[in-house]
Amino acid sequence: MASSYLLLLSLAILASPQTTTHAFSTNQPHHSPPQRVIIIGAGIGGLATAARIKSTLPSSTDVLVLEKNGRDKLGGRCGSFDVTIVDNNNGGALLFRHERGPSLLLLKEEYERLFEDCGKRNPSAADTGNDSSNTTRTAAEAYGLHMKQCIPAYQVVFDDGDAISVGFPRSKCQSSGLTIPQIKELQILEQQSIAKLNQLEPNGSSKWQEYLNTCAAFLDCGLPNFIEERLDVSTLPAFLIEALKDGAKRWPLQPHSVMLDALFDSPKLKAMASFQDLYVGLEPYRNEGQLGGGVLRKTAPAVFGLLAALELHPTNDKAGVFAPIGGFRQVAESMLELCLDNDVQCQFDTSVTRITDEGVYFTSKDESEGGFLPADLIICNADVPFATETILSESSNDDGGSNSSKYDWNDKFDYSSGVIAFHWSFSQRIEALNTHNVFMSVKSAEDAVSSWSILRDGDDSKTSTNNKSLKDQPFNFYVHRASHTDESAAPPGCDSIMVLVPCAPLVRNPELASLPRDEAILKYKQQFDEDLVNDVREAVMERLSILQGLDNLQDTLIDEVVDTPGTYADYYNVGGGVPFGLSHGLGQLSLTRPGAEPSSHDNVLFVGASSRPGNGVPLVLIGAKLVAKKAIEKLRSK
């Protein structure tokens, strides 16, 4: 059985169509056999890297992607799932779509660039979906990826019931699908938001814009020079002017809260300006007990204000929050089509159990079949802390051991928060919610700091293991309502809601490392029991009820799917069950973050959220471009 499974994989590679011409020299004789590249994981990093390598070296490489999950979990954390509910009133079924990972799309041009660089389809023949106003078709749309801007970008809801919308681009008329009445409605909402900013503190609107301008300078300099790893000296003057303004009160490497205290008086404005720090696994507040106020580990340096500019700046050409029509599953599907057009081979339900410089050991989903596949180069899209601890061999002579799957991770890193996710299907429309909503606790300065305690305390503080209900504690959370932008997410008159509540990561137990993977995962899932999940659900429902019309929300809840860190560990082998990966303190940022090339292996490269440059789909796409370049150089030198 094992030999037949290995033969099947080998034949899949050999049977792939080969292009006879290519634009780049590989420094090899034309009669040389193709070099085999194995990519572990069909996440965004794996798919993008595969497409870039194969499109650059079409005839001199065979690229094979091995994915442990089935076809339904293509894209790794970047994916969606459906819930089907029997419609007892009208017969038939109700279909709800939910996101399991990312729910907002940033740096749209990074997605476009991948399809422009590797695509083989004619954009002029693309289906533009339901957007009849869009006459300029893109390479991404040729592969079915349509991205619609969310305006406003966010609704921020405070625990006293105050709410404000932020993120209004100046060029609203250019946004897809907006009619003149819709534009006028948004203009009224924007004026209401400006008035609200000025109510929060004198000149609040101008202070807010001043903050976004500073953050835009950080973004314009940081993206090319520190994320894309390409020098752009033209951005440095504006960066330095903003950093040194007001006696260097906006210095980018100080704790984020220090800069916010210098700019704002209102706790609500400070909260609005810093909630994006959650995405990079950090709190905004200075930690007096740590060196540099905590910026080396758990406190966000002020430079991460660039995330606010990326999402909310009205005129910056990189700014804007978008939604992929059809959900983030469509992002992965479009990328798979891109790979297949470039003759990349993908094999699902296949787990890699060991990586060596010579190739990989693998096993089928039920572990009844497996073997060894040699490779000239291996690219690992599995989570770095998991891979280095569990599947990356320490010896080039490794025989693969038992060739059974395990789950463990390196807990020496600093991690982002874990997440308890509620995926709710409702029999009513939840009109009080925008596409993206952030609920923040700011009743007092103490509450504002305490609401981020899960990021400061980490493993020392489970969500409610202090015997105090979450309802009695300040906490922040995020709510996604996909149907506000994309009506296909829920049936007419219904809604799909995702709630993300930060929690502690899994606590590593070294004794579980030797157990079969399923047994270890089961024990880790027990760290988040039903009582804890129930407490979090009740706390969220209570906070949601502050919005008009949501006081009896549970009455129309018809289905619930709950994910905890144990779920994410099971589905995606992420270290600590943390969907956001490693945090981005200065000790794990840029050159101090795990790089693409592990020092112990010459023929292995890493790509993905926990490696350089960092987490989030656009950063992973940038990382994939950098890793593909390294891979091509390695292959050409062999």
State the predicted function of each range:
Residues 2-17, 21-25:
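N-terminal chloroplast transit peptides
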Residues 633-638:
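Active-site-proximal substrate-binding core of FAD-dependent oxidoreductases
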Residues 102, 609-632:
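A conserved FAD-binding loop/helix module that cradles the flavin
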Residues 33-225:
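N-terminal glycine-rich phosphate/pyrophosphate-binding loop and immediately adjacent elements
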Residues 216-342, 349, 570-586:
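Active-site/ligand-binding neighborhood in enzyme catalytic cores
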Residues 425-563:
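C-terminal segments that line or cap access tunnels to active or ligand-binding sites in enzymes
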Residues 271-295, 474, 478, 542-613:
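A glycine-rich dinucleotide-binding beta-alpha-beta segment and adjacent secondary-structure elements
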Residues 323-324, 350-491, 598:
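Mid-domain catalytic core of redox enzymes
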